[in-house]
Amino acid sequence: MSIPGFGGDENPVEDLSETNATTFHLEGKSEWRFEVPFKTILSLKVTEGVGEIFGTELPLNVPVQLTGVKYALYAPLPEGCTVEYSTRINRDQAPGSSDSTDISEYISEDTPMNQYINLHMALESYRQETADYNYLNPSSPRSGPRVLILGNRSAGKTALARILSSYAYKMDHHPVLVNLNPRDGVFSLPGSLTATPISDTFDLESANGYGGTTTSGSAVHNPKQPVVKNFGFLSPTDNLELYKYQVSKLGVVVMSRLEEDADVRNSGVIIDTPALNIKDINVIENIVSDFEVNVVVVVDNERLLIDLRKKFKHKISNSQLAMVKIPKSGGVVELDDSFIRQCQEETIKEYFNGDRKTPLSPFKTEVDVKDFRYFKGVLSSDFNPSLSFLPSGDSYTTDDMDEDRKKDENSMDKFYTALEDPDASKLENLIIAITQLPQNNKQPKDLLNTCVLGYIHVSRVDEARGKMKVLSPMVAAIPRNILLVTTIGYTE
């Protein structure tokens, strides 16, 4: 018997449905690419040599349990590595699904890892130069590389961000990993924007491959402490103004951390983004400005690189900005909406319930609906109905709006709306962010500047009794009464 959060048997009795182990040798500089459905658990271990997944080295002779992933195991050394794996049915998944339980896998010698490693070495050289300069000039320190990764959807941007972060950590650096894609929950839940100093290896066995945080309890790996800004939607276009504002505020926090922490300052920043193209140049310009980006990496998009070089030619000519294009990995696969949604659900489930190694006991309780103040993000199409008629695929920029239709910058109307009469239709089965605002806060503008303390899930609202049943990751009263209702649905 194990106590949640205090270790225990991480290798329970094997499932009788587990397949016989398969062993093979992966040649050096090659990748073993595999896809594991959610209904299957892949038990993988490297028995000889060195193997890594997105820069995270697998421990020798220690099984790693993976489910619902599309990963690639890379052998960085010429001698390659020996891999052993087996599969079994994932009993945690709902039975009766028609989804396949078979894994898909193949080996490829055509990999862009050499280019990725060269990029890492260039960034490492930048960090060393920065550290040397700051040692000699402590009164006027410089910052390490602030890297912005851009590209189309399914270009491998997130994989590259993880590789660069992992390699930097191996060199004893602690870069800030910034996630600006609200679709992904990076050390947080979907619908958030986060910035996290990388102080340990990523936990590949977690639902999203990053690991746990102190907001959800103890963890096997060193828990990360992200700064979390609530966006509340899954796509930046749902409210572009709110997205840009939150990105800007996150940039302020990150740059402040760089000023105060010499180690993080020398290590720099790595920024992962949603799919952006030249139509989103206003968003890109804001990110470059907010995070003082000095390195832009474009993944497999020559046209975007050319357009950006024209747009930022003054910065490039003044050596304030460097741009580089790198190829897309042949192992990148298109993620369908159902797979993305299931990844999000697993991330939410793990936030409250933990994983196989570290199960958690979330707290279920009833609270009075009237004890809290509720705010919800405004959809751009609701604030400006003309946006509903945009052609599919077109980007929205506020520069095209008439001046008389722009709202005052201090207005909250285009960002949040207060839920004056919260009921089941507005709260039930939704994820709600707990803000860090004090109980008696009366300034609506502070909603934009606050960070997220944690999340709760509303499973049921009893309107007759004025009660709601909530799921919380901790056994305690909800510490704040100002809540942000997201559009992220979840059913236990």
From Swiss-Prot:
InterPro entries associated with the record: Clp1 (IPR028606), Clp1/Grc3 (IPR045116), Clp1_C (IPR010655), Clp1_C_sf (IPR038238), Clp1_N (IPR032324), Clp1_N_sf (IPR038239), CLP1_P (IPR032319), P-loop_NTPase (IPR027417)
Domain of life of the source: Eukaryota
Any single GO CC term annotated in Swiss-Prot or TrEMBL for this entry: mRNA cleavage factor complex
One matching Pfam family: CLP1_N
Sites where the protein binds ATP: 31, 70, 154-159
Main location: nucleus
GO terms under biological process: mRNA 3'-end processing; tRNA splicing, via endonucleolytic cleavage and ligation
An example molecular function term from Gene Ontology annotations: polynucleotide 5'-hydroxyl-kinase activity
Compartments where located: Nucleus
The entry's keywords: ATP-binding, mRNA processing, Nucleotide-binding, Nucleus
Entry similarity comment: Belongs to the Clp1 family. Clp1 subfamily.
Function: Required for endonucleolytic cleavage during polyadenylation-dependent pre-mRNA 3'-end formation.
Complexes and interactors: Component of a pre-mRNA cleavage factor complex. Interacts directly with PCF11.
Name of this protein: mRNA cleavage and polyadenylation factor CLP1
Native organism: Meyerozyma guilliermondii (strain ATCC 6260 / CBS 566 / DSM 6381 / JCM 1539 / NBRC 10279 / NRRL Y-324)
GN (gene name): CLP1
